[in-house]
Amino acid sequence: MNMLYFVLALLVGLAGGFFVGQARGRQQRATLDDQLQREARAEAERIRTQADAEARQLREQAEQRLQDAARRLQEADDRERQVTLQLEAQREQLQAVRAQIEAERARAAQDAARERETLSADRQETRREREELKREIERLNRRAEQLDARGDKLDALEERLEGQLHALAQQEAELAERSRQVDLKLYEVAGLTPEAAREQILRQLDAELEEEKAIRVKAMTERATAEARRTARNVIAQAIQRSASETSSQMSVSVVPIPNDAMKGRLIGREGRNIRAFEALTGVDLIIDDTPEAVILSSFNPVRREVARHVLEALVADGRIHPTRIEEMVHKAQDEMKSFIHAQGEEAAIESGVVGLKPGLVQLLGRMYFRSSYGQNVLKHSVQVAHLTGIMADELGLDAALARRAGLMHDIGKSIDREIEGTHVEIGINLAKRFGEPPEVIDAIAHHHDPENGETLYSVLVAAADAISAARPGARREELEAYVRRLEQLEQIAIAFPGVQQAYAIQAGREVRVLVQPEKVTDAQATLLAREIAGRIEQDMEYPGQVQVTVVRESRAVEVAR
């Protein structure tokens, strides 16, 4: 029992100790927890305080950075506004300078156009004066030759008359006595003085001699003309029937089509750089106006204009239009043009049957492809002249190859007459001498406009072929005003002669038909009148080919039967 109490007491003691230990442990733990919590709160407060301080410091740094950024942004805005103002001022200044440059360019273009017009007018005036002087010299040369021929005839006549003077001297005494008796008889019969009777007889004799002279001149002229015309017709007919060529010539075009009007802006380029580069590289004015789907190329040099046309067509087809591309296309087109010109010269030489030409002459021949005279292509004209000259030379038994060479080369000076001072004849002579052409070719070049002064027959053949090729209908064109003025001048020259009733220019100015008053002009005098009118036309006018003068004298007798 005691044991039980002891055990119970022990258990109670153990239980009490356990509970007491537990209570004390809880108290200690509570105390420790409170201490830990206070330390944790203190540490948290310290961390919070330190974090707040760091946050304030970071906030202040951020605010400082924001202020710095705002200040820098403000400074950048200020600088941007300042630069914008400067750019605006510079842009306005550039626009003003550009406007001034455009105005100066327009003035310069106008001045250049006026200068070109003045130079063209001066050149035409100089050329006209030179042609007039040349015609005057030719007329004086013909007059001198006529006087020389007349002097020879007079010398022969003088020799013949000297032989007759001796016989006439013997008859002089008899004639004097007979004349005295005739005068006395006339005085007795007609009641006239010897002086009056002599004057009447002389007037009658002059009229008879004038009539006889006109009849003889007419007969001799008709006989010589018929013979020469028969021979010339035979030779020329043989040449013409073996030659054929087109009647219209190809003209150099200066209008280039474009696909649409938007292409005009691309051709001009930004601030006009494309058109400036194009004009500077080609030497051709590019005119862009309101013409729909087309632009115009303007230049006095046909070769440069043709190069510019090829360049422009290539640029439009390619679509890449800028100064570098323009320069590439110009160089390419120039090389192609040189090859094309040389090929044209070789083709003309082969077509004409002329061999052995030097490359320089072939190149000059090719340049004539772009040269025209009164609308007629000079190269095709030269080829046709070569054919005609060769055919006529063959008919006359001359060297046909040399004749073709002279015909092909007769206008070689026209290939560069717009670049070198002088007439195409002078330039052609110098070129032929430089390239070592035969003397016959040089003589044909020098005298294909005045064959009567030539030293060989080839100059006459070339002049005839030149006239045939140039004067045939449709070969050349001329201005309407000049054509009408030429017809009026032909009629006025004919009407100015006494005895002319009316005159008409027909067949495009190649014939003048003159109606005369039959009571004032006899049949014999009509021949002399036609010759005088033709001489006046040759002296006072310029005309292609020949002008035929036809004098018509018509006598009518009217009576009424009643």
UniProtKB/Swiss-Prot annotation:
Gene3D superfamilies: Hypothetical protein af1432 (1.10.3210.10)
Any one annotated GO CC term: plasma membrane
Domain annotation HD: ranges: 378-471
Residues spanning the signal sequence: none
Ranges annotated as spanning the membrane: 1-21
InterPro entries: HD/PDEase_dom, HD_domain, HDIG_dom, KH_dom, KH_dom_type_1, KH_dom_type_1_sf, Ribonuclease_Y, RNase_Y_N
Cysteine pairings via disulfide bonds: none
EC number, UniProt record: 3.1.-.-
KH domain boundaries: 252-312
Topology of this chain in the membrane: Single-pass membrane protein
Location of the protein in the cell: Cell membrane
Alphabetized PROSITE patterns for the sequence: HD, KH_TYPE_1
Function text: Endoribonuclease that initiates mRNA decay.
PANTHER family: RIBONUCLEASE Y (PTHR12826:SF15)
Name of the protein this chain belongs to: Ribonuclease Y
